[in-house]
């Protein structure tokens, strides 16, 4: 696997060409704050989701009168990116439309994924360019899996606390699609105590109201200050018993149960005019 390593005096990050996916996020003492990718549970670490978030009905999307096979979270995470820029503290990987991508998604695009270090923070930015001559619908998101418990937080309870103090409604998946019936918020005054039992029914989705930032970690130990830009939807996910929690800011969600397979009809779909550019990012700062 081709890896690019970036580092500063505080952090080291490894990024793979496959999916432009972060593979490790380590502090100077060698502790990795990112999930290890243990195949017993889940081999992912920090996939980039494009051009779709979540599932489509029967894993099929339609664009106009044409139908295309599209697996969960799109194809970017399984695609080989090209390294186009590398410096000590940042790197950029690129994926461009090709005959292979147009067989699944009939649009011309460029997707640049940058990883950049600033002190004890890593900033990941996806820049999407519509290189075609028609409006391009898409979904995009991030899926970073952080260690649970965090290094140095073993034996301590962990929580997620929203910066906005909100209590967003919870939505659940049914067969990989969003059940449109809202449930009571599991947050109390912006705080959710993490419990593996809460994920026995798959991910916890918060399409609206989660704001733009949170703190994940233990109350008196290590934590991560996590924020995002231009991504209105949010989800939490793990596999019960696994040592990670995914903090997932999205633009777009899975299709709804009973909903259309049309890409432009999916909830929270984004649209780029010909020649336009969209930017999306998250920032994770390690504390403690």
Regions found by a protein language model. Name each.
Residues 112-114, 267-272:
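Beta-strand-rich interaction surfaces with strong enrichment in secreted/lumenal proteins
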Residues 12-67:
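Acidic-aromatic substrate-binding/catalytic surfaces of carbohydrate-active enzymes
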Residues 45-51, 257-265:
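Short, structured beta-strand/loop micro-motifs enriched in basic residues and often containing a Trp
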Residues 218-258:
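Glycine-rich active-site loops that engage anionic ligands at enzyme catalytic sites
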Residues 61-65, 270-287:
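Short Pro-Gly-centered flexible turn/kink motifs
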Residues 145-229:
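Active-site/ligand-binding surface loops and adjacent short beta/alpha elements
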Residues 66-119:
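Extended, loop-rich substrate-binding clefts of extracytoplasmic carbohydrate-active enzymes
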Residues 97-146, 151:
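Acidic, contiguous internal or C-terminal segments within carbohydrate-active enzymes
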């Amino acid at each position: 696997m081709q890896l690019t390593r970036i580092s500063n005096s505080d952090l080291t990050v490894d990024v793979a060409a496959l999916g432009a996916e972060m593979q490790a996020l380590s502090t100077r003492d060698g502790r990795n704050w990112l999930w290890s990718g243990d195949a017993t549970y889940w081999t992912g670490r920090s996939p980039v989701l494009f051009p779709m978030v979540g599932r489509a009905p029967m894993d099929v999307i339609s664009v106009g009168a044409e139908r295309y096979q599209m697996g969960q979270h799109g194809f970017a995470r399984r695609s080989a990116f090209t390294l186009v820029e590398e410096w000590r503290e940042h790197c950029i990987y690129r994926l461009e439309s090709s005959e292979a991508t147009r067989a699944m998604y009939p649009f011309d695009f460029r997707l640049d994924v940058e990883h950049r270090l600033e002190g004890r923070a890593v900033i990941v930015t996806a820049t999407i360019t519509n290189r075609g001559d028609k409006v391009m619908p898409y979904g995009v998101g991030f899926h970073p899996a952080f260690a649970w418990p965090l290094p140095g937080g073993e034996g301590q309870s962990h929580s997620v606390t929203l910066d906005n103090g909100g209590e967003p409604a919870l939505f659940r998946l049914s067969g990989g699609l969003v059940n449109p019936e809202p449930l009571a918020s599991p947050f109390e005054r912006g705080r959710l105590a993490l419990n593996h039992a809460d994920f026995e029914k798959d991910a916890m989705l918060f399409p609206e109201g989660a704001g733009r930032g949170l703190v994940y970690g233990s109350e008196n130990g290590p934590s991560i200050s996590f924020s995002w830009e231009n991504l209105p939807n949010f989800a939490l996910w793990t596999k019960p018993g696994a040592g990670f929690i995914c903090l997932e800011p999205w633009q777009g969600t899975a299709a709804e149960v009973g909903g259309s397979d049309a890409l432009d009809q999916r909830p929270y779909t984004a649209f780029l005019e010909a020649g336009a550019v969209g930017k999306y990012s998250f920032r994770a700062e390690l504390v403690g």
